[in-house]
């Protein structure tokens, strides 16, 4: 079913600050997928949605339409899957924390299906760093899916699964602003995870993203806005959280000082180039990294362990993540995934 509103009527509603209902939101995404919206109209729609701010209904409805056209080559594993994909776009140029978190959580027993892409605004996105470390993201889609059952973690490179959106990439790059598609990225993991920790680059996205996850049936999730504007939980100070659990949203806060560790400025997490990002990621995973790098990964990993239902006590989750890192288990998990994806 499609909305009877024309493109210009939908655009006018957005420009007047009116929220779109579920039917109209789905119809808008269908029109993008069916090439029924021109480049000029697309630019106007994306700018209008950005100016208005997207709602949970708009985000969940558009995400569902994208997922409906994303077909899996083999059956989804019957596992409790967790994603650590966030919006990106905080512009802070930190090392790739969420990617490190994925391997730490996997080494603690979480089944990770990480959705990701190349960099939006940072030095390197999750796909960039994994490719540079030798992970084969061009292997068969079947192998990508079976990896989560065999190894306990997999990585889904967004452009491979959402080919219909590739045509919008040049226009989005030309616009040069964060758009609704940055917000949709974490919501359209083809394996439809049961739980998620989702970092946002803007505080006003906390509730809409939480409501979108709730509407999409997420069992447990945490949306996090980090102190100092990070799209991860930060060591700098108080981090704001929206927790999705038992069909409800609740708001919370977390600070590394709660774990008897000192606050550290976000500048300590910044990387200058691609090579240093890879070095830091590897050093965290093998347990040889700086304490600030290890602590920020352990803090975010504790959130993932909560979402996975493995550790309800965040202090216990933090300590569990630290222990795994100190043992070098996350790096072993990375090597297992690398070898698995390379074999025929």
Swiss-Prot record:
Binding site for 5-phospho-alpha-D-ribose 1-diphosphate: 86, 89-90, 94, 96-99, 114-122, 126
Family matches, as InterPro entries: Anthranilate_Pribosyl_Tfrase, Glycosyl_Trfase_fam3, Glycosyl_Trfase_fam3_N_dom, Glycosyl_Trfase_fam3_N_dom_sf, Nuc_phospho_transferase
A Gene Ontology term for the protein's cellular component: cytosol
GO terms for biological process, alphabetical: L-tryptophan biosynthetic process
Pfam families: Glycos_trans_3N, Glycos_transf_3
Residues where Mg(2+) 1 binds: 98, 232
GO terms for MF: anthranilate phosphoribosyltransferase activity; magnesium ion binding
Catalytic reaction annotation: N-(5-phospho-beta-D-ribosyl)anthranilate + diphosphate = 5-phospho-alpha-D-ribose 1-diphosphate + anthranilate
EC number per UniProt: 2.4.2.18
Gene3D superfamilies documented for this protein: Nucleoside phosphorylase/phosphoribosyltransferase catalytic domain, Transferase, Pyrimidine Nucleoside Phosphorylase, Chain C
Keywords of the record: Amino-acid biosynthesis, Aromatic amino acid biosynthesis, Glycosyltransferase, Magnesium, Metal-binding, Transferase, Tryptophan biosynthesis
Binding site for anthranilate 2: 172
Record-stated family: Belongs to the anthranilate phosphoribosyltransferase family.
Complex and partners: Homodimer.
Stated name of the protein: Anthranilate phosphoribosyltransferase
Organism: Prochlorococcus marinus (strain AS9601)
């Amino acid at each position: 079913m499609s909305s009877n509103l024309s493109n210009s009527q939908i655009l006018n509603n957005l420009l007047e600050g009116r929220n779109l209902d579920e039917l109209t939101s789905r119809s808008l995404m269908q029109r993008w997928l069916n090439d029924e919206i021109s480049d000029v109209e697309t630019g106007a729609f994306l700018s209008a949605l950005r100016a208005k701010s997207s709602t949970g209904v708009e985000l969940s409805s558009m995400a569902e339409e994208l997922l409906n056209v994303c077909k899996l080559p083999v059956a989804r594993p019957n596992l409790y899957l967790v994603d650590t994909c966030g919006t990106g776009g905080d512009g802070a140029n930190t090392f790739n924390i969420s990617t490190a978190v994925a391997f730490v959580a996997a080494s603690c027993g979480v089944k990770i299906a990480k959705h990701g892409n190349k960099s939006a605004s940072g030095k390197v996105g999750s796909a960039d760093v994994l490719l540079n470390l030798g992970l084969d993201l061009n292997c068969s889609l079947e192998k990508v899916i079976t990896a989560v059952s065999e190894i306990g973690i997999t990585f889904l490179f967004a452009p491979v699964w959402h080919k219909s959106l590739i045509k919008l990439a040049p226009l989005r790059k030309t616009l040069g602003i964060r758009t609704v598609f940055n917000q949709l990225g974490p919501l359209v993991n083809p394996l439809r995870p049961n739980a998620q920790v989702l970092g946002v680059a803007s505080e006003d996205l906390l509730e809409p993203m939480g409501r979108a996850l709730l509407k999409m049936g997420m069992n447990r999730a945490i949306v996090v806005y980090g102190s100092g504007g990070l799209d991860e939980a930060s060591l700098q100070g108080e981090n704001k959280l929206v927790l999705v659990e038992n069909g409800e949203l609740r708001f919370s806060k977390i600070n590394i000082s709660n774990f008897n560790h000192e606050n550290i400025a976000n500048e300590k997490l910044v990387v200058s180039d691609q090579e240093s990002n890879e070095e830091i990621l590897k050093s965290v995973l093998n347990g040889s990294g700086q304490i600030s790098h290890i602590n920020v990964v352990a803090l975010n990993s504790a959130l993932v362990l909560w979402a996975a239902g493995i550790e309800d006590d965040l202090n216990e989750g933090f300590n569990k993540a630290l222990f795994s890192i100190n043992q070098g288990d996350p790096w072993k998990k990375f090597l297992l995934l690398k070898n698995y994806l390379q074999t025929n």
